[in-house]
Amino acid sequence: MRNAHEMEKALLALFPAAGLEYSFPEISELLDSRSREDKIELSLALQKLLKKKILQESGEGKFTLFGKDKTALTGKVDYVNPRTAYIRLEGEGKEEKDVMVQPDDLRGAQDGDLVEVELFASRRGKQEGMVTKVLQRARNQYVGTLRMKGSTGWFNADYRKMHDEIMVAESDLAGARDGQKVQVQILHWGGANRRPQGKVKEILGQPGEHHAEMHGILAEYNIPLRFSEETEAEVAQFSGVISEAETRGRRDFRPVLTFTIDPFDAKDFDDAISFQELSDGNLEIGIHIADVSHFVQPGSKLDEEAFQRATSVYLVDRVSPMLPERLSNELCSLRPNEDRLTFSCVVKMSRDGKISGKPWIGRSLIHSDRRYTYEEVQTVLEGAEDPNAEVLRLLNRFAIQMRETRLASGAMSFESTEVKFVLDENGVPLKVIPKIRKDAHKLIEEFMLLANRLVAEYAYYFEDGKRSNPMVYRIHESPNPDRLQNFADFAGRFGYKINVSESKVAMSLNKMVASLEGRPEQELMQNLAIRVMAKARYTTKSSSHFGLAFAHYTHFTSPIRRYPDVLAHRLLWNYLQNEARPEKDKLETLCNHCSEKEKMAADAERASVKYKQVEFMGFQDTSRLYEGVVSGVTEWGIFVEITENRCEGMVRVSELNFDQFDHLEEEYCLVGRRSGTRITFGDKVKVRLKGTNLEKRSIDFYLEEIAGATLQRKPAGKQPKVWPSGKRRRK
């Protein structure tokens, strides 16, 4: 016999969608509830669902899902923990509170899914409801570990918001064995009375193996591990020799001094700079970009797959390219001493760095004379001899001027520090080194920003008499006022004043960045400020770029690794040739897809960095002291970032056993009751490694010193807890 809760769940499973109707006898038969006791429980469950307005009675004595009067909202599932999920509302209902949903009421929906949710009557001020329809799945495959129970596989996903165990039938194991890391594709999503079911799509290897883990990260974020045979076959058809027909109509820059500047280990050179003096004493500077759109034609398998990928993904040890390597590293790469097809933005500049006239934009042909690395150019900028030293130093002076102009116009000066790894032949991390951006990097960056801005302006003002042409713009909206105010309040506690008025906020934030120079909290405050900013995205609606202080901006300079740049090239060429204009709505759909894929790629890249940081720390001496900075404070512990390698870990409450602590949430600190010890965001500390967990991608530390004071921890045993502000244990 089912209890009331089980009966309610069984009833809900009978009504997966609107339109189904059952009488009481039909329900009793379907649920095999024939005994008197079962029918009583069934009747009670029906009455409960009627009262909740989940079900309603039709005029024919049948039951169906509650109809038109029920409030239906749309949102995405945030499955925060195994006991609770929230529907983050969007669209017309977004002014409502988020809707809390019990796991049984998700009806098979998972984290990130776009769903329709219906509200229950308000309970104790909470807005609760149940999922009635899954509109769009966020993902249909997961990466994790397979465990065998008899002949059946049970799969646990690495993704921390996938809380359901997935059943894999013997016929769907594809040869996978107990304990292996696999990729599983969902066959059935399950529901209130059944677990999800899947099949093994790919065996990745053993957990902890370098290649298995990196492949696992790619698979986890739906990034393909290889190109389709059809795409590779199309690429194989390209001859590799530029024909006379392909050069026709292109402006020839081959006689002009041209060079590339890239990382030392780069293979996909998608931008080059040319430089020549004109007869009138001015300078002509060309920004030449690989003409990927010449090869990637609409309607081809190559174009279809490039669009689906939308971006190259750069993990710690490998690249998952947007284009097959024959294109990205060979035919499109602007390699030295080879003719290459390009799309160019050419500007005329005076010797004092002022741009005159309109840029020339069009298809071109170049021949790179020299491939520079950033390191080589930096030595030249610092005084080393080079045949092109005068040109490089002049370009650097122009780049510095352009940067100063941007900042004076309200551009943001944030620079977050990234890390790079030195790996051995087996992928084991030997070193973690913060990347340092120098003038050589900024030189190229400023000229690429210039080209992107000029191309966006060119497209925006390029009219065919009646209307502006659609374009793929890169926009960055102003920060959300509430989030900005919260950050200003936070920064104010540390002595930084932020003016949140729209006209002053950029200058105010830049002033804060300047005052942070050399302080322990510099990197942390900058990262927090960056998080407050809106996310840049692609759209057909031209709007200003807040972070760069540009009225119009696009992505034009990296078509080997970004699909929006391919679209920008394609659109520009259509307009220059007066060819058909695309439908704006369809183009907006492409923009949305590219924005989503960009976020997914960034998440995958961060996951690979975190994994390798944890792996690196796992090999370190547990007796060594590391200098670090408190990067976060919670009631369950503090986060510390090691200064020399940017590895972040946690000192848990159980290790802060030299005192009892109150968590003062609004002051971002822990305060010891007896000692008065104050641990707050930005504090300099020394920590010692306690341990690592690769599966959870976490690092644990012992706290040894705060501001130079050595701490005396008690032996392990029953530990005091951290008490939230204002709460005390009852005597």
Describe the function of each predicted region.
Residues M1-V168:
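Charged, low-complexity terminal tails
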Residues R137, Q141-K731:
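Conserved, carboxylate-rich catalytic/transport cores that coordinate ions
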